[in-house]
Amino acid sequence: MEFTLEATSKNARACTIKTAHSTIKTPVFMPVGTLGSVKALDMEDVLDLLGAEIILANTYHMYLRPGDETVAKMGKLHGFTTYPKSFLTDSGGFQAFSLSDISKASENGIEFRSHIDGSKHFFTPKKVIDIQHNLGSDIMMILDDLVALPATGERIALSIERTTAWAKESIEYFRKKQKEGIGAEQNIFAIIQGGTDKAFRTKSATELCALDFDGFAIGGLSVGELNNEMYDTVEHTVKYMPKDKPRYLMGVGTPEDLIENIERGIDMFDCVMPTRNARNGTLFTSFGRLNIKGATYKEDAQPVDSECECLTCKRYSRAYLNHLFRSREIAYFRLATIHNLHYYLNLMREAREAILEDKYAEFKAEFYRKRG
Amino acid sequence: MEFTLEATSKNARACTIKTAHSTIKTPVFMPVGTLGSVKALDMEDVLDLLGAEIILANTYHMYLRPGDETVAKMGKLHGFTTYPKSFLTDSGGFQAFSLSDISKASENGIEFRSHIDGSKHFFTPKKVIDIQHNLGSDIMMILDDLVALPATGERIALSIERTTAWAKESIEYFRKKQKEGIGAEQNIFAIIQGGTDKAFRTKSATELCALDFDGFAIGGLSVGELNNEMYDTVEHTVKYMPKDKPRYLMGVGTPEDLIENIERGIDMFDCVMPTRNARNGTLFTSFGRLNIKGATYKEDAQPVDSECECLTCKRYSRAYLNHLFRSREIAYFRLATIHNLHYYLNLMREAREAILEDKYAEFKAEFYRKRG
């Protein structure tokens, strides 16, 4: 991975990340393709309509179905899904923790039951790297020890200790495998934990950033804390992260969250919000959110967002989308998803332009002004 | 509507139908867009990926939701849906008859309750023309009196009598409105009834074809009768239909049904089969049907049909589609629908080529040979 920090506007950064499969310009929002499909879209949509240079897939989901060995046989993620740009895969730890009825973290890893058939599985730091080798993702994530909040300080301390130990095991195994020619073109990121406690975040960031990872993520946020707690935690944690490597804030967030965290020095984001909300009827626009099922749109001939250049806004009226939503037509899901992801990706392109011109503060002010 | 009979190959016909919105080359299969959306596709798919020159919408459904007056305000079907080519709308009689809990046909029309909210409605021959004026379809269908089979000869005779009476009322009203400038660019087809009884079909066809309709449909087939009964009924009925007007077989059918009925002189078809079966996992190919959920496709790197030029076959493997289907990914529905409709529309293009070369019998033999 080649990383170039091109410009800053105060703490906001415009970078370029070059993987074996694409050149990613940051700030970047990565659409979520849990099962190797960005929900409701096909890969031509992702490429031609959205121009996404990187998407996510979930290790937990692909491991269970169709199975990472099947994916490997079918040409890894790139061959199987036909998406030729970059994939980032999470470690599966979060899903093992949150989707499984039983999930037990021990010193060696996380035991869980499949949410599909109840079968028992055990994820270890090495095991999730093996799986991600099979998936062939451009950026893989380490297994981290997650804690259900609220938790005692003792439990959080244990989580950080374990995450650091697993990170050491992960990076040693990953680099050793690379020397053997396995995953030579892949990259690996560590995940900083510590909740909203600054001392814990300092400790976790300091320990992990001393290791030879290709990039670093901030995990464990956007789990119910106040927005300001999230922003403060990011602002604090970023200080302990290297300037010459990518910074990824996992599972965040609203357009406002993106704007705020870019200002605090984050380069990469992912979230199910634009895709999931699209399916539920919530569309993001330059003037705020719009719930397309509202009766007020029944005979509204305007596009969702007159400033938007997406297929949906260029072609269809709110009235037609309102009708498709109310009639539960499948076509609605794709059109709404295209719009929301286009909005997110375009917002990132505009943020980048502003950083390159060192006008991020003005850009942010204008972003909020339009929302009134 | 301009109708040109270009070529025949025995009884099979290649025609051109020119409406105010498109030039339709027959034999033609019309994708079903019940609610103004071909399920799982958007109109760019229908235009650019399928090249469809005519699609269906259902009067019953559009009347109930969003309402034909809303559609009229939003620019009729063409403006509302953005599909710029031809629309055919049925009369709503079939849905009023089949989707409603209560449905009573009387001398004057059909009373029914909405399947959405239970509200009471009454369709008359004039009322469904008024609705179709609001929808702005290029081809509208008359209200016909449907009979649940099996029925007594007496009831079928009454159905034919009523359908003829309603047809007379319809064509008078439609032409009168045209003189007033309403529906001047629209066309209207009558629907021949009579089950699989040849005497009844003769009577219905003779009576209706004496009237000034723009085309004629054969209704009341593909309702559970044997294939040969359907084919025999079509073969018989076609003899009483004019050569210089389009012939439309409603609600039919499988690829085999299309091939057989083209041979018997049918020009136009519609059916939910390619779209509905796609969603259920059944894909149509040049070598027969394929159920994509089968475990045998889990690691099958081939396209669905190696002879197919659709987006789905050019880009994706059976393995990926199998995975999307099994994972219930929304993207599956669109990719499968694109394939099945592409197959149907392409089959019609090939049939047309064969007719133009007067080689329909050879084409049909080859069609069956490939299926083994």
Curated annotation (Swiss-Prot), chains A, B:
Pfam families: TGT. Residues 251-257, 275-279 are annotated as: RNA binding. Its EC number is 2.4.2.29. Zn(2+) binds at residues 308, 310, 313, 339. Substrate binds at residues 90-94, 144, 193, 220. Its cofactor is Zn(2+). The keyword Nucleotide-binding does not apply. Belongs to the queuine tRNA-ribosyltransferase family. Homodimer. Within each dimer, one monomer is responsible for RNA recognition and catalysis, while the other monomer binds to the replacement base PreQ1. It catalyses: 7-aminomethyl-7-carbaguanine + guanosine(34) in tRNA = 7-aminomethyl-7-carbaguanosine(34) in tRNA + guanine. This is Queuine tRNA-ribosyltransferase. SUPFAM superfamilies: tRNA-guanine transglycosylase. Keywords: Glycosyltransferase, Metal-binding, Queuosine biosynthesis, Transferase, tRNA processing, Zinc. The active site is at residues 90, 270. InterPro entries: TGT, TGT-like_sf, tRNA_ribo_trans-like. Pathway: tRNA modification; tRNA-queuosine biosynthesis. Catalyzes the base-exchange of a guanine (G) residue with the queuine precursor 7-aminomethyl-7-deazaguanine (PreQ1) at position 34 (anticodon wobble position) in tRNAs with GU(N) anticodons (tRNA-Asp, -Asn, -His and -Tyr). Catalysis occurs through a double-displacement mechanism. The nucleophile active site attacks the C1' of nucleotide 34 to detach the guanine base from the RNA, forming a covalent enzyme-RNA intermediate. The proton acceptor active site deprotonates the incoming PreQ1, allowing a nucleophilic attack on the C1' of the ribose to form the product. Binds 1 zinc ion per subunit. The keyword Protein biosynthesis does not apply. One of its GO terms (cellular component) is cytosol. GO terms for molecular function: metal ion binding; tRNA-guanosine(34) queuine transglycosylase activity.
